[in-house]
């Protein structure tokens, strides 16, 4: 596998007067023939990414180009533990014409797999913190340890019947800042410092609020938003003609909603960003199944 560096004049633009993220270069990662990825997740240190290629999870070493298959049974949704050793992912299974979701973990060093949540009909969401995974399954909160230490309580933002739920210290509450009547919330996550919630409100855009739902602030029309750090979020602005995506770009916004920056141009077809916890890289995929990396200065 080789890397292709693309011209920033072609793919990236920014607001020079108020730059939130300083993009140094954009790389296209050439995947093996026939491999198309639908999503990616960055490791915390930016050294590797994991891609989902039609259910096959593959670890891509960004320095050497080495690709290692991790699992063959994924559906969607992935997270990597803070130490970079464990991947959490969702697996869909079907029984009696009903769809169930397993939440699984796999050790990236030895391949050992574990099931954290088994055969859920309503896995609302999950989050990782240090050695623990917090998951909300049909309103019930559980915490599981990824090693031999006792699990800690992880703050989780999740969705139930379109409403925004936040679980703090194992207690779940419906915080839906804009209410629930006629509203649908998506893509919730808790900030790295555990103090704020980022979410997307269908038809309205992305917002940041407090853990209790107070003080919702618009951070712009971006979908699939992710935390870059405690002060900046990133997401995608995609366009379509009703049948397929015609353009998509990555954008960044300050959490107060006052500054927005383009990270790529609309022609880049950039979708579904994932951020390395150290801020060094942002990965994205395209409708063609390609994997790109933004290297941050």
Feature map (PLM): residue ranges:
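Bacterial Sec-dependent N-terminal signal peptides
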Residues: 1-20
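Sequence signature of WD/YWTD-type beta-propeller architectures
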Residues: 19-297
